[in-house]
From Swiss-Prot:
Main location, first listed in the record: membrane
Domain of life: Bacteria
Gene: lptF
Keywords: Cell inner membrane, Cell membrane, Membrane, Transmembrane, Transmembrane helix, Transport
Protein's recorded name: Lipopolysaccharide export system permease protein LptF
GO CC terms of this entry: ATP-binding cassette (ABC) transporter complex
Organism expressing this protein natively: Shigella flexneri
Family per record: Belongs to the LptF/LptG family.
Amino acid sequence: MIIIRYLVRETLKSQLAILFILLLIFFCQKLVRILGAAVDGDIPANLVLSLLGLGVPEMAQLILPLSLFLGLLMTLGKLYTESEITVMHACGLSKAVLVKAAMILAVFTAIVAAVNVMWAGPWSSRHQDEVLAEAKANPGMAALAQGQFQQATNGSSVLFIESVDGSDFKDVFLAQIRPKGNARPSVVVADSGHLTQLRDGSQVVTLNQGTRFEGTALLRDFRITDFQDYQAIIGHQAVALDPNDTDQMDMRTLWNTDTDRARAELNWRITLVFTVFMMALMVVPLSVVNPRQGRVLSMLPAMLLYLLFFLIQTSLKSNGGKGKLDPTLWMWTVNLIYLALAIVLNLWDTVPVRRLRASFSRKGAV
C-alpha cells in the first residue's frame, strides 16, 4: 500500500538520522575515555581506533531500539501535527495502517539487533579484552609514553624515556625496585636504545652508552657498571581470558551455562530484541499529539515509559546476576506488563472498547 510505504520511508529517514546522532554522541564519549586512558599510559596510543571500532556493537545494543522508538515518535507526531494522519482517518484508514508500518520497521531493526546481541556483541567484547590483555602482557613500543614515568603493573619497576621515534628511544631511566628472585635492586641509565621484535613474539631491548647501578648504598657490594651495549630479552607472555565472562559468550553457551550471571545475560539479550517490537507497538498510540499541548509535552509520557522500562530491566539484570532474584521471572514479568499496556493503548480508541467504556459509564450513571 502506498500509505504504508510512505510511512515507512518517512520513519526510516528519521530513524537513520537519530541513529547517526546517537552513535556520534556515544562514540565521542567513548573516544574521550579512551584518549584519557591513552594519555595516562594505560593503553597504547595505536589501539585507540581499534578499541573505538570494537565498542560500536556494545553501543548499538541500546541505541537500535531507541532509534526506532524516537523515529516513530517524532515522525508520527509530526504527521499528527500537520493533520496528515487526521486526513488518513477521514479517508477510512484505521490505526492498523500505522501499526503495520511500525511492525515492518521493527522487523528489520530486530534482525539487526539480534545479529548484534547474539554474534557481533560477544565477538567484539572478546576481541576487545584480547587486545587490552595482549597490550598489557606484551606492551612493546606502542605502550611507551615519552616524557612520563611509567610503573609496571606489579610495581616492580619504573621506566622513563625522554623521546620515542619508531623503535628507537633516547635518554632512558629504568629502576628495578623489586626484582624477581635473588636479584638486587638496580638502576640503569642510557643515552639511547631500540627495541627489536622477534618472530616468536619475544622482544629484544638494546641500550647504548649507559651505566648500571646495582645494590643498595648501605651495602659494600654496591656496583657501578658502564656499558656500550646492554641487551635484555623480554619473552612473549600468553594471554588468558576469563572463560566465565558472560559478555563474551554466544547464545548457545549462555543457554547451556547454569549460573545466575548467564541467565541474566541471556534474558537481557532476548529482551533487547523483544523490546524492538514491544516499543514499536506502544509508540503508535503514544505519538498522538494534542494541538493544545504541543509535540514536546505529548512526547513526555512515551519517553518516561521507555526510560522507566530500561531502568527497571537494567536493575533486574544486575540483581539477577548477583543471585538476588530470578531474572527469567522478573524480567519477563516486566516485558509482559509493558506488552499488555501496549495492546491496551492500541485498543483503547477502537469501536468495541468505546462501546464497552460507554456501557460502564451508563452503569455508573445509574
